Amino acid sequence: VCPLQNQDTPNGELMVPHRYWPQDEHCQSLNIWTNKLDPEAKKPVLVWFHGGGYAAGSSIEQVAYDGVSIAKKGDSILVSVNHRLNILGYLDLSPFGEKYKNSANAGHADMVAALQWVHDNIALFGGDPENVTIFGQSGGGMKVTDLMQIPSADGLFQKGLVMSGVMEGDPLGAGEKDGTEIVTAMMKELGFDDVVQLETVPYPQLAAAYAKVSP
């Protein structure tokens, strides 16, 4: 699960328990539920993108995200996706050089990579790579509409279900501040003079610096 900038309050956890652990920066992963490993089955494939905007959430955060019932009772395969979020997935470092030109879209690149993996491998789990439906709720719905507009995702899914959620503004909610202003302020907060030093900072320290300088 991608590390989270903010954790839920104890009261919130009592009302709606979440599963946000274990957390790690290397969070790109898939969960797959199927009732038969038959390469000839060609079952419809459902790919779930979790809510939480672009800052929080996980593919297994709620009990309702468990795909066992669909795999047992339905005739389809369920895949759920973890990807980079918040500053790991969407901090814009592009003003600081070619190396970072796609940094503000890393989370979406993870989603496309997940769909590519599904396209290339889901037949081994009994799925049909030409019958893939992506769906999501709240922030997950936003991701579905985004993926419909990303050229590199063309052909990796055939249908999309938006279960609430629409994208407006930038993923980190930086408002009018651009990448240069925010990242420069973060480096000042951390006492750095070179953007490459951000790559050496543990996530909690990086998130704390961002929280201090973000809108």
Report residues per predicted region.
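Surface-exposed, low-complexity/disordered Ser/Thr/Gly/Pro/Asn-rich loops and linkers
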Residues: 1-21
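Substrate-gating cap/lid region and adjacent catalytic-acid/histidine neighborhood
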Residues: 159, 167-168, 193, 197-215
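Serine-hydrolase-like catalytic core of hydrolytic proteins
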Residues: 15-195
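Generic structural signal of hydrophobic/aromatic residues within well-ordered alpha-helices
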Residues: 11-12, 183-186, 206, 210
